[in-house]
Amino acid sequence: MPFTLGQRWISDTESELGLGTVVAVDTRMITLLFPASGENRLYSRSDAPITRVMFNPGDTVTSHEGWQLKVDDVREEKGLLVYCGQRLDDETSAELREVFLDSKLTFNKPQDRLFAGQIDRMDRFALRYRARKHQNEQALQQWGGLRGMRASLIPHQLHIAHEVGQRHAPRVLLADEVGLGKTIEAGMIIHQQLLAGRASRVLIIVPETLQHQWLVEMLRRFNLLFSLFDDERYAEAKLDSSNPFETEQLVICSLGFVQRNAQRFAQLVNADWDLLVVDEAHHLVWSEESPSAEYQAVETLARATPAVLLLTATPEQLGQQSHFARLRLLDPNRFHDYQEFLAEQQQYRPVADAVTLLLAGEKAQTAELNALSDLLGEQDIEPLLKAINSDSDDNQKARQELIAMLMDRHGTSRVLFRNTRQGVKGFPQRILHQIRLPLPSQYQTAIKVSGIMNANKTLEVRARDMLYPEQIYQQLEGDDATWWNFDPRVEWLLNYLTANRDEKVLVICAQAATALQLEQVLRTREAIRAAVFHEGLSILERDRAAAYFASEEEGAQVLICSEIGSEGRNFQFASHLVMFDLPFNPDLLEQRIGRLDRIGQAKEIQILVPYLENTAQAMLVRWYHEGLDAFEHTCPTGRTIYDAHHAQLIERLTTVGEQQGLDEFIHTCRQQHDNLKQQLEQGRDRLLEMHSNGGEQAQLLAQAIAEQDNDVNLVTFALNLFDIVGINQEDRSDNLIILTPSDHMLVPDFPGLPQDGCTITFDRDQALSREDAQFISWEHPLIRNGLDLVLSGDTGSCAVSLLKNKALPVGTLLAELVYVVEAQAPKHLQLTRFLPPTPVRLLMDRKGTNLAAQVEFESFNRQLNAVNRHTSSKLVNAVQADVHAMLQQAEALVEAQARQLITEAQEQADLQLRRELERLEALKAVNPNIREDELTALESQREQVLSNLHEANWRLDAIRLVVVTHQ
């Protein structure tokens, strides 16, 4: 092509320079000026890697002055193009010579990029199409937010999260027993609400001691990066905003932190949260006469926030008044009068009795049948009542149907979820081993001296000190004291570990100093590999210690944890727990055992307690075991009995030598424990348990998600994505891959990839046992960000390939076109449930025939060969007129497919949302816990969804030209 001064060209290799202008031409060389970047380039005339920029009728171009022109015609004058058409600003006719085109011109449409020579690699085109397909398939999955968590697939947890997470502004009480995973349930609900766009701002309020546990759980299990607000962080944020809480979307803080300052609390309330989560909500004290300041603070926040999750102890442990107080936070209009609530609860007693009858499988007597009829009076249930007393195959089905009807009418089943260990099977047996050891003379002396020196300390402080004689000795003797040389617990631990080399052993002690000293002794005395876990370590350092312990190959045999350091970490792969000392209260004891005693623990848990005779430890072992049965079973009564006997317990811990009355004290505690436990068992609400654990549906949900684990398509796509993006991958032998950034990535910082890299696995079980490995799923930020990176930009939007096929004539031209059918709408409407961005692939020939149905993408892609960009540009220029014609023919074909997709989406949305609305309206007639605002929100959502689907459209997303060759 002849070159003329003023012509506009674009660089094939440096498209970021913008639009270039020919400023010098001689016999062998040309010079281009790129005004947008201020750069000059000198090219050889014979083979310059540049492409002439030529627009066509229908295109919109921008002048260097900023106004835009809709092109109607193009003519050439002395080698320069003149665009004729209508200005978009004042609708007047105008001409624009190419020399006056905006130099910052970018090409967004795939066909424009193709004709401008901005041609991408063919592997990127394939990646873009696969990304579109996978994005579409994942959007249609019904378990979004549940699949990507790094946690075992526990049916009752999945059921609660699925049930609550799908609601508009859920306000519920999660009251599972300890060890059943309330934190995970809350995390799954948060994750779903965020992914679905129902929430974007989340506030978690927890006790100060649990802040880091929540921070770790949300990050490690759900890849949610919360900001922990304390005084220091608040002061920093105050520099950036008048309301510091508006500087972050996801926030964790303690109630004490915000209560200390009235202005701070007001800012928190006014920060427009979408979802409020309150842990340990049973500590919020309430009475009708004088609610506590903490309760009132949470009440104020709950009223200002649409969605609320309260995590609390079980209702039976709380007592009815305390339970009512929690429900009142969720729905003050519904739960406004305590006496009315008590009367209503009595009315639900027959419902629970009826369910017990149906579950038992026995035939119903006349009185029982009448009771069922009364409870479900407005329904035609006569056939079902007959079926439950028959021997037909319909018996069980009828019972399940009646139970489902009763559940819909249950008083608080929509706002309260409560599972018990008895209702959820799969927990291991706990076996206690008490190891009685002699009290060394050094400790005897230290304890006596300490008693004299610390007489002015409070009784409680002295009692706590008595539990840790090694610390008493260390304080008296100084830093050079070597208590581990004579403490018989150390010798016992060494012998136990050397005798059980093949077992992973978790050792927990109260103090970080004790943990560090024990690790040193194990390493120097017996070369035992041990990791240490304490509050002085960063989260990353704790991850590494946990991973070292979890590793089967060359991993640590022992993990030594301090009390605080072990919070929020679970080690189900180990089954041996050594308590080097004992905690001060039963909640901490259960927390220690809970590190191993989780659903998914495959072995019996061996609890080993080496204790020194005639010490506070010895007395506490007896009280925990004989008084509370707290070692071998969970102890829901522990806190109640501890509070009731707190003063007496402290006194006995400080006067261990005086054994008088100890047996009676322990016997009294045991009687109280047995009585309370019996009351709790009698108060079990089996209907609520059924509703909370999800039954067979929950099992099917867990199975369905498990079947999607280790998805081969995910592994293939992810590795292909990492390759093309330019992320380094290093395979490890144990199903792990190390990812690190490279110098040639598509973007300087890949979202979700740390600067120092990360370790990933596609195996859920592997991720659970390796704290340092990230579990890759379709919901992981690396994959979601990767999809966004590819699809939100131009990556792979146009390509040119060669097809070596002697069955076709040389020069045969095919255009592979990928259109996207999509609807634009606010995220919270979740339009993607019905019409996610949907790729429609066409494979056009010159005759206007679509061959896509006969030629599958992957097999076709494998037959193609890449072409360099310069050659590609020449090919495109040669067939530009043909491509325009093919695009026009394709437009008519894609319209029919797109309109069909849109119509189907409208019908599905109307049917699904109408059914949902009708179901809630029917339930509201029999269950007052259906809130009016839920119905209003659903009706509004239905109208908006249908309106936005009506506006759905389609566009060309990617184009690949394929030219047949025989060479």
UniProtKB/Swiss-Prot annotation:
Keywords: Activator, ATP-binding, DNA-binding, Helicase, Hydrolase, Nucleotide-binding, Transcription, Transcription regulation. ATP binds at D176, E177, V178, G179, L180, G181, K182, T183. It holds the Pfam family Helicase_C. Coiled coil: none annotated. SMART domains: DEXDc (SM00487), HELICc (SM00490). GO terms for molecular function: ATP binding; DNA binding; helicase activity; hydrolase activity, acting on acid anhydrides. A motif (DEAH box) lies at residues 279-282. CDD domains: DEXDc_RapA, SF2_C_SNF. Interacts with the RNAP. Has a higher affinity for the core RNAP than for the holoenzyme. Its ATPase activity is stimulated by binding to RNAP. Transcription regulator that activates transcription by stimulating RNA polymerase (RNAP) recycling in case of stress conditions such as supercoiled DNA or high salt concentrations. Probably acts by releasing the RNAP, when it is trapped or immobilized on tightly supercoiled DNA. Does not activate transcription on linear DNA. Probably not involved in DNA repair. HAMAP family: Helicase_RapA. Belongs to the SNF2/RAD54 helicase family. RapA subfamily. This is RNA polymerase-associated protein RapA. It comes from Pectobacterium carotovorum subsp. carotovorum (strain PC1). The lineage of its organism: Bacteria, Pseudomonadati, Pseudomonadota, Gammaproteobacteria, Enterobacterales.
